[in-house]
Structures are given as structure tokens and as C-alpha cells.
Swiss-Prot record:
InterPro entries reported in the protein's UniProt record: ADH_Drosophila-type, NAD(P)-bd_dom_sf, Sc_DH/Rdtase_CS, SDR_fam
Keywords, ordered alphabetically: NAD, Oxidoreductase
Name listed for the protein in its UniProt record: Alcohol dehydrogenase
EC number of this enzyme: 1.1.1.1
GO MF annotation, one: alcohol dehydrogenase (NAD+) activity
GO BP annotations, alphabetical order: alcohol metabolic process
Gene Ontology cellular component annotations, sorted alphabetically: cytoplasm
Catalytic activity reported: a primary alcohol + NAD(+) = an aldehyde + NADH + H(+); a secondary alcohol + NAD(+) = a ketone + NADH + H(+)
Annotated organism of origin: Drosophila borealis
Active-site residues per Swiss-Prot or TrEMBL entry: 151 (proton acceptor)
């Protein structure tokens, strides 16, 4: 999918990976980039507008843990303004296994609810035009960082949800793929809290191994958007973009 002239909603588009990805997106010339984030950052919004003045960059405060009805109401406002939305990026995430319920609420339930809400406007069974969902999951959805089992499980759940969305595309008209970054140097990594403090130095230990920058991750993210492959499981690790071939161990046969 060419980004040029598209309308894009980016949930958590001002975070570490999110902000660099927003920068790369506006360089590609979308018509509108709507950023939904819990914390306002006027400086970052101004920077994004300055990168490409032809792009309309809009900010709305949004917490992914709000009830589904509130998300639907916000999206109704956005759709009334833009008329159409081509791509939804779900990027909200926290990494703190001390906060079990919030980790699940942000990393998994928030992704599900935001996606469910936009189906009201996209689902072809309701006369919608369809759309594309890009969910930021994690390589920990493939193989857990066992010291942060809650985070890893929440990302595995988001990945499974995304894979199901892709399979439902013939019914809904909505395609989906997952973005799975490896260890990326962001403030999130430095604030690691392991489950029950089983490894207080988990963040430090991870950073002792090869990592990638947020810019490297963002540049590959844009390549994945442009590829627009329904059902793709993209691994963004060490500055590389890799299409993961998922091994099927069981099939429901329905």
C-alpha cells in the first residue's frame, strides 16, 4: 500500500518506535496522519507537521483502556472529519510485569477493542469499504522472554488475534498483519520490571546483546506498510525486515 494520499490512524504514534515511525510515515506523504495517544506532546506534533507541511497531522488524547463505546465515539468523530480511513496502526504497549492487569489491558485488550470499534466503520457486511490493520506485537510473541511472562503472553495474544483477523478478511473486508520488533533501544526497555522481581536486571541484560535503533525499526515498519501483505508476520530485528513463516501444529478444520 502506497502511503501517499492515504488516511492513517496511529495509536501510540508518539512513543519510542511510534514517533520515529510517524516521522517516516509523514515523509511518505499521507493525506492525514491522526495520532491517538495517552500523553500529548505538542513539540512532537509540531515537528511532524514541519517535516511535511502537505500532510495534515492531528492529535486526539486516547487511552486504549477506555470502554469500547468511548473508542467507537472517538472514531465516529474521526471518520466524520476524514470520511475514509485506510490504515489503523495499533501501537500501544507497556512493559512492566509488576502491573499485570494493566499490561493485559494495554497490550492486548486495548488492541482488540480499538480494532473492534473500527469494524463498525469498515466491515463490508455493514456496507463498509474494508481497511487495513497493522498491530505492533513483539518477537516475544514467538518465544517469550521468560522473566517477563505477562508481557510476553500479552504480545502472543495480540499476535494470535492479528493472525485471526487476517483469516477473517474474506468475511469482513479488513486485512491485517503484525509488526514484531526485536529488542529496540527505547525508554521501554530501560524500565523493564520482571514478574515477581525474578530478574531485577532483565533490561540491562537484554541491552548487553545486539539491538536495533528506533529509526531502523521505523524504516522497516514503513516497508512492511508498503508491502501490505495480509496475514504477514513481520519480524523487525537488528535492522532487518523478515517475513516469518508460521508453523502450524494444529488445525480446527472449520
Amino acid at each position: 500500500m502506497a502511503i501517499a494520499n492515504k488516511n492513517i490512524i496511529f495509536v501510540a504514534g508518539l512513543g519510542g518506535i511510534g514517533l520515529d515511525t510517524s516521522r517516516e510515515i509523514v515523509k511518505s506523504g499521507p493525506k492525514n496522519l491522526v495520532i491517538l495517544d495517552r500523553i500529548d506532546n505538542p513539540t512532537a506534533i509540531a515537528e511532524l507537521k514541519a517535516i511535511n507541511p502537505k500532510v495534515t497531522v492531528t492529535f486526539y488524547p486516547y487511552d486504549v483502556t477506555v470502554p469500547l463505546a468511548e473508542t467507537t465515539k472517538l472514531l465516529k468523530t474521526i471518520f466524520a472529519q476524514l470520511k475514509t480511513v485506510d490504515l489503523l496502526i495499533n501501537g500501544a504497549g507497556i512493559l512492566d510485569d509488576h502491573q499485570i492487569e494493566r499490561t493485559i489491558a494495554v497490550n492486548f485488550t486495548g488492541t482488540v477493542n480499538t480494532t473492534t470499534a473500527i469494524m463498525e466503520f469498515w466491515d463490508k457486511r455493514k456496507g463498509g469499504p474494508g481497511g487495513v490493520v497493522a498491530n505492533i506485537c513483539s518477537v516475544t510473541g514467538f518465544n517469550a522472554i521468560y522473566q517477563v511472562p505477562v508481557y510476553s503472553a500479552s504480545k502472543a495474544a495480540a499476535l494470535s488475534f492479528t493472525n485471526s483477523l487476517a483469516r477473517l478478511a474474506p468475511i469482513t473486508g479488513v486485512t491485517a498483519y503484525s509488526i514484531n520488533p526485536g529488542i529496540t533501544r527505547t525508554p521501554l526497555v530501560h524500565r523493564f520490571n520482571s514478574w515477581l522481581d525474578v530478574e531485577p536486571r532483565v533490561g540491562e541484560l537484554l541491552l548487553e546483546h545486539p539491538t536495533q535503533t528506533t529509526l531502523e525499526c521505523a524504516q522497516n515498519f514503513v516497508k512492511a506498510i508498503e508491502a501490505n501483505k495480509n496475514g504477514a508476520i513481520w519480524q523487525l530485528d537488528l535492522g532487518q525486515l523478515i517475513a516469518v513463516e508460521w508453523t502450524k501444529h494444529w488445525d480446527s478444520h472449520i
